Amino acid sequence: MLKRRIARDRAASVPTGMVSNPAAAPILFDRALLRARMERARRAGPATFLLDRVREDMEERLQAVMRNFADVADIWTPGELLRGPVADRFQSIRRIDPDQSETLRLPPQSLDLAVSALAFQFVNDLPGVLAQIRRALKPDGLLLAAMIGGDTLMELRQSFAAAEAECEGGVSPRVAPFADLRDIGALLQRAGLALPVTDVDRVVVRYDSAFSLMADIRRMGATNILIERRRTPTRRATMMRMAQIYGERFADADGRIRATFDVIWLSGWAPHESQQKPLKPGSAKTSLEAAVKKTGPK
């Protein structure tokens, strides 16, 4: 069994060429507020059911990879992701805590594996972060991550929009915009990662009311951190109407409501000459026409 070394990100300098250009990306999220709310959730006793599910899935996915990973980084996961027998496979694990900055202080080609859970959905410059991870991976190194996306909290979004339009004559952004599967696949390719794969794990959770759901969201540290969020308190009448609409549209026969969480899984490898590559145009030994003639009716 390998002896593990677990370290926190304390690096003060950034290697040349490792910084993305966050100024070029739109600033959607207040990451300082995110950090404060995650700390508040930690002190209050966090809701970890999604992280627990992702951790289990992460362990299974890593066990399926027949590869030894010595140097590993866990990027911005709000809690402990790698532990137990799976973590014992690694020589060192560097945990990078959630921060206001989106600059990863990781030397080039220093990692065999980069993992992250439930963090990338609140990144302003996700293409830049993926590019930084790609540079930090050794050739044939792996990125494996899970983020919230797709139709997550679509019920809450629709209920708030309907209630605000009815009670206040307008709609304010309540739930962050989430990337979908196709977006993430394209970003992996744009970052220069080979063999990109994405899939989605839909989790439907039932609650007694919309207010119970919102309490769980607070305990995840995942309440509204949009820069353009509403800064004034929501009227009580709007909140009550939102909960009523939620129950009318998204409740089961027993009166409990449904909440959707889409966990998008993404993986990609730093390019290496040993990896399978697509055939170049014109390199096939048999043309389609010849194949059709060969297999067609006699």
Residue ranges and their predicted role:
Residues 79-90:
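Conserved SAM-binding loop of SAM-dependent methyltransferases across substrates and taxa
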Residues 59, 191, 211-298:
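C-terminal lobe and adjacent flexible extensions of AdoMet/dcAdoMet transferase-like proteins
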Residues 2-5, 11-56, 281-284, 288-289, ...:
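N-terminal, positively charged/glycine-rich alpha-helical extensions of SAM-dependent methyltransferases
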Residues 112-127, 131, 147:
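A short SAM/SAH-binding and catalytic strip from SAM-dependent methyltransferases
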Residues 127-142:
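A short glycine-rich, Lys/Arg-flanked "PGG" loop and its adjoining helix->strand segment in the class I
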Residues 103-114:
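A short acidic, Gly/Pro-enriched loop at the edge of an enzyme's catalytic core
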Residues 49-71:
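Conserved alpha-helix/loop element of class I SAM-dependent methyltransferases that forms part
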Residues 146-212, 220-233:
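Conserved catalytic/acceptor-binding region of the Class I
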